[in-house]
Design a protein with these regions (language model features):
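Flexible, Lys/Arg-rich cytosolic regulatory linkers and terminal tails that connect or flank
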Residues: 4, 234-297
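N-terminal Rossmann NAD(P)H-binding glycine-rich loop of SDR-like oxidoreductase domains
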Residues: 298-316
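Strand-loop microenvironment adjacent to phosphate/nucleotide-handling motifs in alpha/beta enzyme folds
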Residues: 245, 288-292, 444, 448-636
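Proline-aspartate-enriched helix->loop->beta-strand connector
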Residues: 213, 217-219, 320-321, 366-375, ...
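Conserved Rossmann-fold cofactor-binding substructure of NAD(P)-dependent oxidoreductases
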Residues: 353-373
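A solvent-exposed beta-alpha-beta segment
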Residues: 35, 40, 44-46, 140-257, ...
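Conserved Rossmann-fold NAD(P)-dependent oxidoreductase catalytic core, especially the SDR/UDP-sugar
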Residues: 244, 258-260, 376, 382-383, ...
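Signature of alpha-helical transmembrane segments in polytopic membrane proteins
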Residues: 1-152, 180, 196, 219, ...
Length: 636
């Protein structure tokens, strides 16, 4: 290693050069400039004759420059991070020193020990010194950036050329150590021409994009906040990037960025598969929901689950008077309790570990808190588990719903909102059928109240939607775990498709549908475009960067469909107040008959076997046809 390399490595390994070191360098440059200008104007021999006196003169002239350095703090910055502001400070300090020297020369007679320097030479030496100080700072910064700061940085393109992309570019240029080096911008404008932005070229977003990135050795794409929605809805572009092993990083979406503040490079994160699935932006009438929930008493069952905990989060933002949060899972409910204490300490909240099927305990809670709104998210949801344990599906899902619904009526709850599932439509599984029975019960109870057959004021609303991204036990966390273990990734069938929705988006629609409904409705959510599960698995494997992960097809599970529905053959839908929400028009059931059938079903769970229990479920829901299941014999 050369001496220069050793010195530069030593210097840049330090946090900064001591301030006296910067002052010493600047003083040397001023002395050198004065000596050089005088020599060029008066000759080498003449300069050598008076060299001692000349050096004394230059040292005296240095004093006002030192005062200027002090006044303008030219030594307070770190040279490797010099900016235009730092160069300005140097310019002002040199100008101050020059003016002081000229004024001193005009007002006083120079001592015989000092050499008279013409004003022109003083000005030229000051300009030269200032230029050298600027050059020194620019060189150190450039050398540091090009050699040390970006040594381990990845070359990156930025998708987006407006304020979001520019702010992102500025952010990554100020990183230390650098994570990324800007190699180019990508624009959706058809005709880009030969345009440059912040010193790099702007390229069109077309089929040549991957080739351009490879040619420039860029293997990272940074997505501007204003382009988050665009890349989600451009699946062709996403597929090309993933297949080329281009890593994608995202910043907060446009709605989370005010468009003015600087973006921090710490906000950049590598995308998850959830970030890249196509979805429409969902807006709800926040003021209408706020008007319904603010200052009210809210009870939420299943409050520690994926959906329930998000409902807790979103309801808390509307400042209810009291929240009663029920779940039988102790540890995750404790996490919800801590979240409430940390995020909404002013809300009176109660976390209750209990089974919703225990009517006596639930009645104590209703009598004490008398909730205005009930959000019922508690349910067993795992398909294979419920196929093996139909009595628990009935006990928890069906009877638990009936307990909470009956108590809501008894204690004057204004509105009961039940979270259902698209698996309740033409059910082929026990879990889906149990949720359909829940729908039948709350709908028939709502109609009985309207008809005056049951005394009460409660309005019952059902919300029905499909899979949510990232919920506990869902396919995406499962695939992540399988990839982490090295595979294989298991998919039940190559043609299986599913609808997906983000948990926060689903819960927004639950809140709006629940608060806006008039009772008796089954609200069906528009889940967007379906996703092939095998395509999802392939994308996740590519995003992980792990090679050689096998996808293994295991066959459809008991009761599993190739695709899910939100309406059955006999149901139609009509539009509502929200374009993403429709009302399913389903056939009505008699409350007394439904209640008797459910009584018999719940009793059967205590005295009969699985086959008899499922047979009774099929009698209540005739469209329940088992598939790939031991219960298929009951349909013959």
């Amino acid at each position: 290693m050369s001496l220069f390399s050793r010195l530069s490595t030593w210097y840049f390994s330090k946090k900064s050069l001591p301030y006296w070191g910067i002052i010493l360098l600047d003083c040397c440059l001023i002395l050198f400039s004065g000596l050089l200008v005088y020599t060029l104007n008066n000759g080498v021999l003449s300069t050598l004759d008076i060299l001692g006196h000349l050096l004394v003169t230059l040292l005296v002239c240095l004093i006002p420059y030192l005062v200027g350095f002090r006044l303008f703090h030219t030594y307070s910055g770190i040279i490797r991070y010099s900016s235009f502001v730092d160069l300005q400070k140097v310019g002002f300090a040199v100008l101050f020193g020059l003016i002081c020297v000229v004024v001193f020369q005009v007002l006083t007679d120079f001592s015989p020990y000092l050499v008279y320097i013409r004003k022109r030479d003083l000005i030229l030496s000051a300009l030269l010194a200032m230029s050298l100080m600027w050059m020194m700072r620019v060189f150190v910064k450039y050398f540091y950036v090009s050699t040390f700061r970006v040594a381990k940085a990845e070359r990156a393109f930025i998708y987006g050329v407006k304020q979001g992309g520019v702010s992102l570019a500025k952010s990554i240029q100020n990183q230390d150590p650098a994570r990324f080096v800007l190699a180019g911008f990508i624009s959706d404008m058809a005709e880009i021409g030969n345009r440059y932005l912040m010193g790099v070229k702007v390229y069109p977003n077309n089929e040549d994009l991957i080739g351009v990135m490879r040619r420039l050795q860029a293997d990272v794409l940074l997505v501007s906040p204003l382009k988050v929605e665009a890349i989600r809805n451009n699946q062709e572009m996403v597929d090309r990037l993933i297949k080329a092993n281009i890593k994608i990083y995202m910043t907060p979406a446009a709605q989370e960025w005010d468009g003015k503040s600087d973006l921090s490079h710490t906000q950049l994160r590598e995308v998850n598969i959830e970030d890249l699935l196509p979805r429409d932006k969902i807006e709800i009438d926040l003021e209408a929901v706020r008007e319904q929930l603010t200052g009210k008493r809210i009870l939420i069952t299943g409050a520690a689950g994926s959906i329930g905990s998000e409902i807790v989060r979103q309801v808390a933002q509307f400042a209810p008077e009291r929240m009663v949060l029920i779940d039988q899972a102790e540890t995750p409910l404790h996490d919800v309790r801590l979240m409430m204490a940390r995020g909404w300490p002013d809300i009176e909240s109660y976390t209750v570990v209990s089974d919703i099927c225990v009517r006596e305990r639930m009645e104590e809670l209703f009598e004490e808190h008398r909730p205005d709104y009930v959000f019922h998210a508690a349910a067993y949801k795992h398909v294979p588990m419920m196929e093996d344990n139909p009595e628990e599906s009935v006990r928890n899902n069906v009877d638990g719903t009936r307990v909470i619904a009956d108590l809501s009526v008894k204690y004057g709850t204004r509105k009961f909102v039940m979270v259902s599932t698209d698996k309740a439509v033409n059910p082929t599984i026990v879990m889906g059928c149990s949720k359909r029975i829940c729908e039948i019960y709350v709908q028939s109870l709502d109609q009985a109240i309207k008809d005056g057959k049951v005394r009460g004021r409660t309005q019952f609303v059902t919300t029905r939607f499909g899979n949510v991204l990232g919920s506990n036990g869902s396919v995406i966390p499962l695939f992540k775990e399988q990839i982490k273990r090295g595979g294989p990734v298991t998919v039940t069938h190559k043609d299986i498709i599913r609808f997906f929705m983000l948990i926060p988006e689903a819960c927004k629609l639950v809140l709006e549908a629940g608060t806006m409904g008039n009772g008796g409705e089954i609200f069906v959510f528009d889940m967007g475009k379906p996703v092939r599960i095998v395509d999802l698995a392939e994308r996740m494997i590519r995003l992980s960067g792990v090679k050689g992960i096998e996808i293994r097809f295991t066959g459809l599970r008991d009761g599993e469909k190739l695709y899910e529905e939100v309406l059955n053959e006999e149901e139609t839908s009509k539009p509502t107040f929200h374009p993403k929400i429709k009302i399913a028009q389903v056939r009505a059931y008699d409350y007394a008959d439904a209640n008797l059938r459910i009584d018999a079903l719940v009793h059967a769970c205590a005295v009969e076997g699985d086959m008899q229990i499922v047979k009774r479920m099929k009698e209540i829901v005739p469209e329940f046809k088992s598939q790939h299941s031991k219960y298929e014999v009951l349909d013959e």
